[in-house]
């Protein structure tokens, strides 16, 4: 009888092609997502070597990082570098026979939102993309992670990837989430607990009642930010919630193929007695709405808290780092989080740009107005999300409240397109990174949930969503 295995062990074993004595392994890759930023050199490498894409039907190309989200984007991309990258992806997809969603295709959007929407992402698969937030797809019980440009070329050419196996880590969130606390708060709390290096060398499996109670969209938010916790990939075992989400998607198996897939997917869970190298346990009842205060995703605190004093940190290097963060953020120790005013609000990204996120925002802002001191924008994660939001009338709620309703794309999550902060501007953002300059040169980013961002837009400063009337 074989030893008990974790979910990660099972997916790894099912895709192992070869293993060397030093632990170097060759893994088969089921799905490959590509976008315009990390793929041009990879396709050019194939072209120069005279190679084809080995399995074009297992590759999907989407533009997202560089595309403008303004209503006039049909007029073309003004930035020359961005335009060149987008045009290169269109040309490469055509030359190599890869399916491609252009900025004019309603299926276009952020690659990690598009994959699940299309049923391209399925349980038990290995999924890669030249993007660190590929971990998002782990919400389906898929082993998904980012790869570098040279690896993108390797996967295009061989449909395999050279890797070494990571360690197993379990993060269990027990109990029920209190009102006002969301998946975004869970993952920020986890990163605050383990630090940005806490998952280094591991694949994290998320489990527990609070995780199980989440929708697929909430689970994607959790797995999306696994990389911010230092782990390469995050996993949540598939269940009926997963299967119900997938069933009607365009690329999902149909008929007998569905029944066969379902039988396999139901085996994708960690066996009782399986070994984890590290276990972290949180109690959902203890979790508040969370706001980041510094320039690292681990710099988080309750909305009811105050900016911490770095002098309380024993370790000298870390203490200096946190003082630098406060200086960059223009904050002083002891400042109440609810006293921090914001200039901008960004709602979107592959972390929180899905329809449930937008519904949560609409509940907060309906019948209210964005503060006169705030500029706020909402960027749907895909054309299909935008279409659904407009069918539900959410866009009218947003526009009447004073939000800028945009076209789909990565937008202000990162300063690679026209949507960016000006120096010194402070932003409540539903994205995933608050590094220095992430949203624009000298821009200041606070990571929050969609509901918290929406409330900040109306109030002009951070407020506790639990007290929102």
Curated annotation (Swiss-Prot):
How cofactor binds (record note)?
Binds 1 [4Fe-4S] cluster per subunit.
GO biological process terms, alphabetically, are:
L-leucine biosynthetic process
Top EC class of this enzyme: lyase
Keywords assigned by UniProt, alphabetized? 4Fe-4S, Amino-acid biosynthesis, Branched-chain amino acid biosynthesis, Iron, Iron-sulfur, Leucine biosynthesis, Lyase, Metal-binding
PROSITE patterns named among the record's database cross-references: ACONITASE_1 (PS00450), ACONITASE_2 (PS01244)
Annotated residues that bind [4Fe-4S] cluster are located at 350, 410, 413
Lineage top rank: taxon: Bacteria
A single Pfam family, by name? Aconitase
UniProt pathway = Amino-acid biosynthesis; L-leucine biosynthesis; L-leucine from 3-methyl-2-oxobutanoate: step 2/4
Give the protein's cofactors: [4Fe-4S] cluster
What EC number(s) are associated with this protein in UniProt? Answer: 4.2.1.33
Catalysed reaction(s) here are: (2R,3S)-3-isopropylmalate = (2S)-2-isopropylmalate
| InterPro entries in alphabetical order | 3-IsopropMal_deHydase_lsu, Acnase/IPM_dHydase_lsu_aba_1/3, Acoase/IPM_deHydtase_lsu_aba, Aconitase_4Fe-4S_BS, Aconitase_4Fe-4S_dom, IPM_dehydratase_rel_enz, IPMI_cat
Q: Which GO terms describe its molecular function?
A: 3-isopropylmalate dehydratase activity; 4 iron, 4 sulfur cluster binding; metal ion binding
Q: Which family does it belong to?
A: Belongs to the aconitase/IPM isomerase family. LeuC type 1 subfamily.
Q: Which PANTHER family does the UniProt entry name for this protein?
A: 3-ISOPROPYLMALATE DEHYDRATASE, HOMOACONITASE, MITOCHONDRIAL-RELATED
**Quaternary state and interactors:** Heterodimer of LeuC and LeuD.
Role played:
Catalyzes the isomerization between 2-isopropylmalate and 3-isopropylmalate, via the formation of 2-isopropylmaleate.
Q: What is this protein called?
A: 3-isopropylmalate dehydratase large subunit
Q: Which organism is it from?
A: Sinorhizobium fredii (strain NBRC 101917 / NGR234)
Q: Which gene encodes it?
A: leuC
